[in-house]
Amino acid sequence: MALRSPKSSRGLSQDPTTRRIWFGIATAHDFESHDGMTEERLYQNIFASHLGQLAIIFLWTSGNLFHVAWQGNSEARIKDPLHVRPIAHAIWDPHFGQPAVEAFARGGGLGPVNIAYPGVYQRWYTIGMRTDQDLYTGAFSLLIVSTLFLVAGWLHLEPKWAPSISWFKNAESRLNHHLSGLFGVSSLARAGHLVHVAIPESRGGHVRWGNLLSASPHPQGLGPLSAGQWGVYARDVDSSSHLFNTSQGAGTAIPTFTGGFHPQTQSPWLTDIAHHHLAIAVVFIIAGHTYRTNFGIGHSIGGALEAHIPPGGRLGRGHQGLYDTINNSLHFQLGLALASLGVVTSLVAQHMYSLPAYAFIAQDFTTQAALYTHHQYIAGFIMTGAFAHGAIFLTRDYSPERGRGNVLARVLEHKEAIISHLSWASLFLGFHTLGLYVHNDVMLAFGTPEKQILIEPVFAQWIQSAHGKASYGFDVLLSSPNDPAFNAGRSIWLPGRLDAIDNNSNSLFLTIGPGDFPVHHAIASGLHTTTLILSKGALDARGSKLMPDKKEFGYGFPCDGPGRGGTCDISAWDAFYPAVFWMLNTIGWVTLHWHWKHITLWQGNVAQLDESSTYLMGWSRDYSWLNSSQLINGYNPFGTNSLSVWAWMFSFGHLVWATGFMFLIPRRGYWQELIETLARAHERTPLANLVRWGDKPVALSIVQARLVGLAHFSVGYIFTYAAFPIPSTAGKFG
């Protein structure tokens, strides 16, 4: 008999039921579980997957460039970046009636088009791309790079070129490559591109391959560099009257320390950004060489960890044994990487609006809303993934004997204290915040709004004041005219920063008040609850006091239901899916607070948020309802507008989200009955019964059903929530 799929598992391929299909999909990338898998082959497969993923990323970015060059309006937008709406691509849809054709014909396009909200137009403009030919060249170049990575992935699976296990486990060399090579050299390349191409373009010049070596980025060339007079390069900065993309008001400085924003583009000065990338390059290139590689100089990470035993004795064996624990567990390494990447992605969301690096992106409000929403949701999924792989590490890779007495073992020994403290914090934040909101709602409902509990966030205001925001009147550190740092900031370093901080038209230091206080604590409640569920799920992944080590009891991973001792209670997967529920809710609050804060700032009516965000009816009425009018009329019996696709997504998102509960709540018996009923009906229906299948239909397991439920819940939630801030902004500002 021919071997059926999945070829990775002989046992599963011989399963006569539909379990073969679903388990085959579920374990397709679980290389560890595949037949005949060795540790070396596992590392090689993952390495090849990395190269394949990079190939897909470069192909995707190539497609962005190509479609904008082909169907976009980049050259028209460069002439008027504040008023011409950027086109992502054309829409060809046979279902479009004349009202839809007219509604979607925007941005100077010849027919229906999609408007681009990811900020790529602003990015390409900032880095010096000025023509469609530039975009085509970039698309073709990235297509070549994508092909190279695809070939590299295939090549490194061939026995002759496949790296050995020792190569993968050489942590010092990997850090050297990642820190110095990827971060350091790429930052240096970025600084070089800004200095040689982007900054000259912003000053009305034009540098391409033909004149790259002859066009000096500074009038004095390399003279000051060789003479050690580096300060020369920072003199003669662009003036406040500089018109971007022209020589009017332009200076000659390359790396600067000006601070603040370019008055016209409302983005940080390009010369400041070049200086930043140069500094990052120096730091990371040095950092990557602090570890011992082939040359016998620098630190051994293993040696440093083994020697790190705190003298007080309160941390037991300290970090002994951690090097081997981490270096031999891909799940531990992935957990650390995902935790770091998740935090960085959330920071990107925050910096996209507070320090908008690309020219004119700060004035494209819908793009700001889209980028913030996108990056916060991505960050949430990545961070929950960190906990998931931490739990898998404990389940599959952790050896209590090898790590006995070190810091990781002590964390596990203290897990009851960790979980109970997180529980206390979550309960405190949740009940007090809800109490504040409900009290304020009742006071307004009873006609006594003056009896609301309004709390000024004085600690946060003090921190903002210490950094230079003078409007609160704290007169402390950088907000005090008598402070030495204040005076130094006016002349020596970042002279434009304090002006930017005190400018209420940007988002650098948003003014905060009593409306921000409860929503901040609501978000804190959500964050702590998510962390509580994830931490408990990971820390209890192997067992609890009831069941000391689940791994030794022969149970399947992750959970065998209440009938066999209640192991679902100590299942990381069963903690993971309610944690994703909480993560999505929390980011919903984060995103909607950000959006209301900014939409009132952009419209010039910040008092609306200040007055209405202190009670729940204010949120429902003055934010949700008030900003939904154009959206809920995206399509109606009288016609359609350009928000109709978002209106449809909003409705469809609710349906997908609700479908998720159908999988999350019922148990396996319900599904088995439903499937057998459907199968029986199918086999007795004329024509339909001509289609047969070889596998006996069986219900999804609890774990699989929860995965299907979680996928629907997550996708539906994001379709519902993201389809509010983005189009409601577009309806007001385009």
Swiss-Prot record:
Its EC number is 1.97.1.12. Chlorophyll a B1 binds at residue 654. Phylloquinone binds at residue 671. P700 is a chlorophyll a/chlorophyll a' dimer, A0 is one or more chlorophyll a, A1 is one or both phylloquinones and FX is a shared 4Fe-4S iron-sulfur center. It is found in: Plastid, Chloroplast thylakoid membrane. It is a multi-pass membrane protein. Coiled coil: none annotated. The keyword Transmembrane applies. One of its GO terms (biological process) is photosynthesis. GO terms for cellular component: chloroplast thylakoid membrane; photosystem I. Keywords: 4Fe-4S, Chlorophyll, Chloroplast, Chromophore, Electron transport, Iron, Iron-sulfur, Magnesium, Membrane, Metal-binding, Oxidoreductase, Photosynthesis, Photosystem I, Plastid, Thylakoid, Transmembrane, Transmembrane helix, Transport. Its main location: plastid. PROSITE patterns: PHOTOSYSTEM_I_PSAAB. It catalyses: reduced [plastocyanin] + hnu + oxidized [2Fe-2S]-[ferredoxin] = oxidized [plastocyanin] + reduced [2Fe-2S]-[ferredoxin]. GO terms for molecular function: 4 iron, 4 sulfur cluster binding; chlorophyll binding; electron transfer activity; magnesium ion binding; oxidoreductase activity. InterPro entries: PSI_PsaA/B, PSI_PsaA/B_CS, PSI_PsaA/B_sf, PSI_PsaB. The keyword tRNA-binding does not apply. SUPFAM superfamilies: Photosystem I subunits PsaA/PsaB (SSF81558). Chlorophyll a B3 binds at residues 662, 670. The chain crosses the membrane at residues 46-69, 135-158, 175-199, 273-291, 330-353, 369-395, 417-439, 517-535, 575-596, 643-665, 707-727. [4Fe-4S] cluster binds at residues 559, 568. Belongs to the PsaA/PsaB family. The PsaA/B heterodimer binds the P700 chlorophyll special pair and subsequent electron acceptors. PSI consists of a core antenna complex that captures photons, and an electron transfer chain that converts photonic excitation into a charge separation. The eukaryotic PSI reaction center is composed of at least 11 subunits. PsaA and PsaB bind P700, the primary electron donor of photosystem I (PSI), as well as the electron acceptors A0, A1 and FX. PSI is a plastocyanin-ferredoxin oxidoreductase, converting photonic excitation into a charge separation, which transfers an electron from the donor P700 chlorophyll pair to the spectroscopically characterized acceptors A0, A1, FX, FA and FB in turn. Oxidized P700 is reduced on the lumenal side of the thylakoid membrane by plastocyanin. NCBIfam families: psaB. This is Photosystem I P700 chlorophyll a apoprotein A2. It comes from Selaginella uncinata (Blue spike-moss).
